[in-house]
């Protein structure tokens, strides 16, 4: 039966309205937490991701470094955790071992964006637990020895020190109180940055995070204490973080500094002297090398209501790895990305040293109780450097605490 023309048009109009008023696909909001003070990296990448598509919007919250773990644990326990979090790599095992992080092993294996074979083994291992992958390294870094070539020449020192004893002797020669110049600066603060700096010395001294009182580790702490006792370093090293302590070097008020590649951008512009970077000195000539392995891992909380969308965000961040160094002075955790020349000869030479140092870098842990282990370590060197305990007694006490944790 044919509909009358008016009835047909009315039916067509109603059908068109129905089609036009079908509900649109809702935009998914993914919440993300990361630390503040990361050269604006996450802020920029989140902005770019949000601008690149309209299906997912990332809401980013920046949390102070010292507060991130405790706030994240509380949030997960109360059902208020974000979808994505960026955690310092030694803290990752605390969350993944407790079932707080989503197992992304299969998602990564099926991803057309992420290829785990191109990641450095150390950073990738820090995002793993019990044979499964719970996160992805954002970047990686390590520490080496910065030195002021002008002050070295003035003191008659031809090269950067290669052993601990040479470092101590050079610091004595370079120390110049009359001109407000210390021999060396670094971070020995009571916190993760201090452990980050001290653990490589323990490892070069034959120890590990689970064995911190070897004779070599004791010698390392004796040297740290001597540097402070002889006023070859400012007392501020006990409280300053790496960024601020290296600022002393940049200002020309310390002849050496132990710090990382995140300093290179401002050093190229702020330092008004000739400088270089050398591998960390070893306990003895030709002795075993080590260095810290830093930076953050991205993971998805197991409680996330939007795991697929959250994984798309992580894939996007992984796809932007070639931007990490040129824009943010971060070294990618991937071996397939060549660092571009910066145009600054000193910076380019320093990057080669840092890349070599990375081959010796070791993770902190991984262990679910890393924060307790780290506290035992920084409590020990703080106690020794402030004269409360001898270096040996302090490290023996730390070892007793750590043994009770790791068994």
Regions found by a protein language model. Give the residues of each.
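Extracytoplasmic "Venus flytrap"/periplasmic binding protein-like
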Residues: 28, 48-119, 128, 153-162, ...
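Short, polar/charged alpha-helical segment
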Residues: 37-57, 377, 395
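Hinge/lid segment of periplasmic solute-binding proteins
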Residues: 89-142, 168, 194-197, 276-278, ...
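Periplasmic solute-binding protein
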Residues: 92-100, 122-159, 187-209, 229, ...
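C-terminal lobe and pocket-closing loops
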Residues: 93, 99, 109, 260-274, ...
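Short, solvent-exposed loop/beta-turn-alpha elements that line the ligand-binding surface or hinge
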Residues: 105-119, 183, 188, 202-222, ...
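Conserved C-terminal helix/tail region of periplasmic/extracytoplasmic solute-binding proteins
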Residues: 153, 229, 356-407
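Glycine-centered hinge/linker elements that transmit conformational signals in sensory
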Residues: 170-177, 210-238
């Amino acid at each position: 039966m044919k509909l009358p023309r008016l009835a047909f048009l009315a039916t067509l109009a109603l059908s068109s309205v129905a089609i036009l008023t079908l509900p649109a696909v809702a935009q998914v909001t993914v919440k993300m937490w990361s630390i503040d003070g990361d050269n604006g990296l996450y802020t920029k990448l989140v902005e770019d991701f949000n601008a690149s598509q309209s299906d997912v919007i990332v809401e980013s919250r920046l949390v102070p470094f010292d507060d991130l773990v405790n706030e994240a644990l509380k949030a997960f326990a109360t059902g208020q955790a974000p979808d994505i979090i960026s955690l310092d790599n030694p803290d990752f095992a605390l969350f993944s071992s407790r079932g707080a992080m989503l197992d992304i092993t299969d998602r990564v294996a099926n991803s057309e964006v992420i290829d785990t074979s191109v990641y450095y083994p150390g950073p990738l291992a820090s995002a793993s637990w019990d044979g499964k992958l719970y996160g992805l390294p954002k970047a990686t870094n390590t520490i080496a020895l910065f030195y002021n070539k002008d002050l070295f020449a003035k003191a008659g020192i031809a090269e950067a020190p290669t052993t601990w004893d040479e470092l101590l002797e050079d610091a004595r020669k370079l120390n110049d109180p009359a001109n407000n110049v210390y021999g060396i600066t670094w971070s020995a603060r009571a916190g993760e940055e201090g452990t980050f700096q001290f653990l490589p010395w323990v490892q070069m001294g034959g120890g590990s995070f689970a064995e911190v009182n070897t004779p070599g580790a004791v010698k390392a702490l004796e040297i740290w204490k001597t540097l402070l006792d002889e006023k070859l370093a400012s007392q501020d090293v006990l409280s300053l973080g790496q960024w601020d302590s290296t600022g002393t070097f940049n200002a020309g008020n310390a002849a050496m500094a132990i710090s990382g590649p995140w300093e290179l951008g401002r050093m190229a512009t702020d330092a008004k002297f000739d400088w270089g970077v050398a591998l960390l000195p070893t306990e003895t000539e030709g002795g075993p090398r080590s260095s810290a392995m830093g930076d953050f891992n991205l993971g998805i909380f197991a409680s996330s209501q939007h795991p697929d969308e959250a994984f798309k965000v992580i894939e996007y961040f992984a796809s932007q790895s070639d931007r990490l160094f040129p824009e943010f002075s971060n070294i990618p955790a991937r071996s397939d990305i060549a660092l571009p020349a910066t145009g600054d000869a000193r910076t380019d030479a320093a990057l080669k040293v840092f890349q070599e140092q990375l081959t010796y870098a070791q993770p902190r842990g991984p262990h679910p109780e890393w924060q307790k282990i780290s506290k035992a370590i920084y409590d020990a060197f703080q106690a020794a450097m402030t004269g409360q305990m001898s270096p040996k007694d302090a490290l023996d006490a730390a070892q007793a605490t750590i043994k009770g944790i790791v068994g």
